[in-house]
């Protein structure tokens, strides 16, 4: 884990955010890390079946992944809250809504709110490429999705190490299951996301840059089973605002 002295990391209410490798709060910051793009993740987002790929496709994949790595400026932010008996986050005025999130957090007495983004350079690259080369734009989009997944996975791995011997759940994002996408607004308010790491929120609850993720993570004294994830397993699949916009909430 890339962190400074983490003696205060379990203190609720601390707002911890990083821009690239800059620690903004001594003793609590965890580094925003993009250390690679998983080729299988990129292919998954492209919907490619298994088996060998033509040489020209492999070359495009390599070009696209390297371009995303070059342009990305990862940023992350997170904050810890105690969880009350009714599921409310103490002192926040926010209670995550829906049966799915209540069940997901049922063993947890604390909740981490987090957000991550690849930054506007990646967003602008995707927009420019869509206007001139749609085939390359699709590859770049898939590579960027794999990249933001890497950033989130790295943050979660670092948090798991920092909170040990306690246990963390998977990530659970607004719009996933029956957690309303409208509750993005609460995460933005509590984390001060727009000002801190430069993500804006549209009226429909989608984020710009689009390669951004917000999520809740539970903290428990009990080991947490890894739950089935992904669009196909989501009860909101048919009505998902992310999917209709051609993006996802960032869950694998």
Residue ranges of model-derived segments:
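Active-site helix-to-loop segments that bind/position phosphate- or nucleotide-bearing substrates
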Residues: 22-132, 136-137
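Conserved active-site and cofactor/substrate-binding residues in soluble primary-metabolism enzymes
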Residues: 56-59, 63, 146, 150, ...
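Short cysteine/histidine-rich metal-coordination sites, predominantly Zn2+-binding motifs
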Residues: 247-252
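Short, positively charged and aromatic/hydrophobic N-terminal segments
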Residues: 14-21
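Short terminal or interdomain "cap/linker" segment that borders an active site or interface and mediates
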Residues: 118, 166-242
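Conserved mixed alpha/beta catalytic, RNA-binding, or beta-rich assembly cores of soluble enzyme
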Residues: 108-173
């Amino acid at each position: 884990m890339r962190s400074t002295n983490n003696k205060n990391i379990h203190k609720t209410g601390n707002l911890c955010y990083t821009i690239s490798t800059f620690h903004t709060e001594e003793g609590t910051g965890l580094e925003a890390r993009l250390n690679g793009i998983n080729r299988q993740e990129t292919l998954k987002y492209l919907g490619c079946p298994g088996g060998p790929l033509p040489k020209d496709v492999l070359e495009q994949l390599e070009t696209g992944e390297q371009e995303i790595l070059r342009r990305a400026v990862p940023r992350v932010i997170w904050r810890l809250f105690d969880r009350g008996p009714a599921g409310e986050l103490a002192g926040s005025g926010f209670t995550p809504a829906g049966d799915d999130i209540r069940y997901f957090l049922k063993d947890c007495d604390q909740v981490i709110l987090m957000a991550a983004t690849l930054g506007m350079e990646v967003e602008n690259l995707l927009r420019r490429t869509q206007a001139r080369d749609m085939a390359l734009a699709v590859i770049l989009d898939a590579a960027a999705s794999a990249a933001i997944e890497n950033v989130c996975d790295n943050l979660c791995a670092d948090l798991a190490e920092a909170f040990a011997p306690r246990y963390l759940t998977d990530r659970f994002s607004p719009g996933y299951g029956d957690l309303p996408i409208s509750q993005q607004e609460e995460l933005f308010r509590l984390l001060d996301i727009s000002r801190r790491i430069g993500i804006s929120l549209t009226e429909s609850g989608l984020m710009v840059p689009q390669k951004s993720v917000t999520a809740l993570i539970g903290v428990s004294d009990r080991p947490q089973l890894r739950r089935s994830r992904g669009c196909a397993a989501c009860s909101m699949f048919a009505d998902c605002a992310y999917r209709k916009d051609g993006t996802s909430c960032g869950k694998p």
